[in-house]
């Protein structure tokens, strides 16, 4: 839960007000210049209009060097960040041939599979030689290899569902699947902080969409009771079906879903549960099986389980795991399955190999070690950040930990200074977050050593003092018992 102090809120609003005022003033003079030069083609309306276009031109471009930084190596614990420069006040960024070796705190490489792996990489290279980079076809027309069917069976076994279906892109998994599950006459109840892919999927479904307060089973029950009592708009007929959509770990908050309580509410009102485990599958739980394992939930109680391969497994794509009837329905009706080229075979092999390492089926215990390390690293880093006085969102065991920045001036200051000290962080602002709630999102990996984390904490602490984002008093250092006895 964000605890935004009043003074911070006022200074943040004042900063945005100044930026808006100066932006409007610059736009006024730009219109005068364009009118005299007759620059615009007569009769054509401007393509880009509105406040979002204004935000991009007058606010985002000032700090765009803090986003989309290209890299020149695998996104391991350390990677090479390409240096860029601008000759036109940040409107255009140009790459140089120079790179900076930085500690990586931005990638979703939770288990460290994104870099070369002694077990996975040789198998991926072998699959590339055998199957080529692409099937050049859709799943229903020559695009299904032995690897695709093997991965579907393996995913179903791993998450504890009867069947699974693969997709070549994680975002599409949500945005294309949801309209196939519910349509006109149906009701979607979505967490207020669900990912944009869920939002777009719900909008495109034609179903009625209602939102409940973030991670609040009590408010979810209120919304369900109200909607069931009222029925469909205008006709007041009963809903054809109701689907409640939540995430395992919320990617911008680092919070775990209150899954047991939400499932209890859904069962009470006969609503289906749709769980997005993009950031939790493979990253949490004793054996990496996500929030169901971590929170003691039977996978059979979750009707539809979604996940991606881009985080813990070091690949690309996504999956849906559910009953055989639902999966068969999706294979025959989902455009992303019927019309899109199937997942790249080497990418499929990477996921197969990664899951086998996690399960210990590679003949080693590296998977268990990775899971223990990501849990230990995450909890250590979160605890130390809080001790320093930062406002850190999220729960224990979550590898995602946002550090609140708030003020727009602190976004580039924090990002650029960390990069200067060779720590690469991701800063997130509007429209990915509410306007007043800008943050830096730290992602921890099992590939980080304790020395890496201590270095990162040292840099972040110094930059935090410089930028002024330690919103709470730091804990005093603990005196060892022996030293305490000496003092006495």
Swiss-Prot record:
Listed name of the protein: Long chain base biosynthesis protein 2a
Annotated family: Belongs to the class-II pyridoxal-phosphate-dependent aminotransferase family.
Gene3D superfamilies linked to this entry: Aspartate Aminotransferase, domain 1, Type I PLP-dependent aspartate aminotransferase-like (Major domain)
TM stretches of this protein: 4-24
Main location: endoplasmic reticulum
Pfam family, one: Aminotran_1_2
Pathway(s) served: Lipid metabolism; sphingolipid metabolism
This protein's record includes keyword Kinase: no
EC number: 2.3.1.50
GO biological process: ceramide biosynthetic process; sphingosine biosynthetic process
Cofactor(s) of this protein: pyridoxal 5'-phosphate
Subcellular location: Endoplasmic reticulum membrane
Keyword flag Lipid metabolism: yes
An annotated GO cellular component: serine palmitoyltransferase complex
Keywords tagged on the record: Acyltransferase, Endoplasmic reticulum, Lipid metabolism, Membrane, Pyridoxal phosphate, Sphingolipid metabolism, Transferase, Transmembrane, Transmembrane helix
N6-(pyridoxal phosphate)lysine modification, residue list: 311
Functional note: Serine palmitoyltransferase (SPT). The heterodimer formed with LCB1 constitutes the catalytic core.
Topology relative to the membrane: Single-pass membrane protein
GO MF assignments: pyridoxal phosphate binding; serine C-palmitoyltransferase activity
Subunit: Heterodimer with LCB1. Component of the serine palmitoyltransferase (SPT) complex, composed of LCB1 and LCB2.
InterPro entries from the UniProt entry: Aminotrans_II_pyridoxalP_BS (IPR001917), Aminotransferase_I/II_large (IPR004839), AON_synthase_class-II (IPR050087), PyrdxlP-dep_Trfase (IPR015424), PyrdxlP-dep_Trfase_major (IPR015421), PyrdxlP-dep_Trfase_small (IPR015422)
Catalytic reaction equation(s): L-serine + hexadecanoyl-CoA + H(+) = 3-oxosphinganine + CO2 + CoA
